[in-house]
């Protein structure tokens, strides 16, 4: 792979990562397809994906930085409004705990058995079905805003997040659907999902990066930097656009799109 082509690949995959990481469509499925079409796969591609995910994480921090600092009691001299900042670090810990425990226990097994195209294809379909269930059978909204979310609901979202350990299922799809099925509004469930993503993705990406450290070299820096920066910028735009769209749109189009991507995976890798 020439240097110019490597930078092109980094730019394209950065766009794909930034667009899909926080939408309920599975970034893994998209990265597998696009990486294959670009001829970029294998151990280095997996490490590259981990690095550019950090760009997407940084985008969440940039969008929700006041909330994130508020979790640890830092408000930059501003007094929180009535009812504001009741979302606490306890909510985040409860949301993280199930996936952290199960993820650490079966991390190696997941890497060995669930990263194939066929299993990702099934996960895309399963995640799409969950989105439809969440839209069609969700109960009446009991938690309208982020600050209305209870500890019980946070733990429930954490349990749903375990589904995202299955590559292709979509972490945001699992957590947002879980939140809606527990009576959280679509908007609040999405916001909680994004905030919860920061510690979860930092932990997961940090672990993967540590295990892949021998694959990194300074020669890869330009490619990784382009992918990281592109993912950050695109993810910023995607997050803000998504939060605006879900005020008036449901998740059925995302479910249908997942089925289309699953069919594409079938055509490219399975058929």
Curated annotation (Swiss-Prot):
Any other comment in the entry? Bacitracin is thought to be involved in the inhibition of peptidoglycan synthesis by sequestering undecaprenyl diphosphate, thereby reducing the pool of lipid carrier available.
Q: Tell me its family.
A: Belongs to the UppP family.
**Which organism was this protein described from?**
Aeromonas hydrophila subsp. hydrophila (strain ATCC 7966 / DSM 30187 / BCRC 13018 / CCUG 14551 / JCM 1027 / KCTC 2358 / NCIMB 9240 / NCTC 8049)
Transmembrane region(s): 5-25, 45-65, 86-106, 114-134, 149-169, 189-209, 226-246, 251-271
UniProt KW Membrane keyword: yes
Q: What is this protein called?
A: Undecaprenyl-diphosphatase
User: What GO biological process terms does the UniProt entry carry, in alphabetical order?
Assistant: cell wall organization; peptidoglycan biosynthetic process; regulation of cell shape; response to antibiotic
Per its UniProt record, what HAMAP family does this chain match?
Undec_diphosphatase
**Physiological role:** Catalyzes the dephosphorylation of undecaprenyl diphosphate (UPP). Confers resistance to bacitracin.
Q: What is its EC number?
A: 3.6.1.27
Task: Tell me one Pfam family matched here.
Answer: BacA
